[in-house]
C-alpha cells in the first residue's frame, strides 16, 4: 500500500483507517527548519494539520511568517515573543492566534521547556520562512544554545 503524501516531510497522514495518534510518542519532525528549535509529532488531515510541539527552554524561533494561519495552545511552560508587532506572554492554558503571513517570533522562557499544540490550515505545510530570508538557525536566549551547552560540558570535566 502506498503512503499518502503530506505537505510536511515526516508527518503522518490521517484517514484511510488512521483515526487516533499517540502524538507525544511519534517521530519528531522539525517544525521550523533554519529558524526555530520547534519539533514534534505532526498529523495532517485533508485540510488541517496538528502538531504536538516541543521547544527546549531558552530557545525558539527567529522572526518568521507562513502562508497559513495558525493557533498555538500552550500545554506546559511559557512562550514569549510577538505576533504582528504585538507582544505576547503566554503561560500554560493560553491560546495564541497567528494570522496568515503575520511576522512572529515565539521563544520558550528560560525556566522550563514548552509543549504546545499547533493547528494550521493546509494551504501550506508546518514550516515557514524567516523574515530576513536566511536559514541561519534558531533564536537562543543568552546562556542557551549549542555554544552554551558545550561550555557547560567542558566546565564539568
Features from the language model and the residues they span:
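A short, N-terminal "cap"/entry segment at the start of jelly-roll beta-barrel domains
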Residues: 1-47, 129-157
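Short beta-strand segments in beta-sandwich/barrel cores
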Residues: 60-62, 77-82
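Short histidine-centered beta-strand/loop micro-motifs
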Residues: 40-42, 61-66, 107-109
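Glycine- and acidic-residue-biased ligand/ion/polar-headgroup-sensing regions
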Residues: 68-79
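Short acidic-glycine-tyrosine-enriched beta hairpin
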Residues: 86-100
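Conserved short histidine dyad/triad with adjacent acidic residue
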Residues: 34-36, 51-65
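Ligand-binding loop in jelly-roll beta-barrel domains
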Residues: 100-126
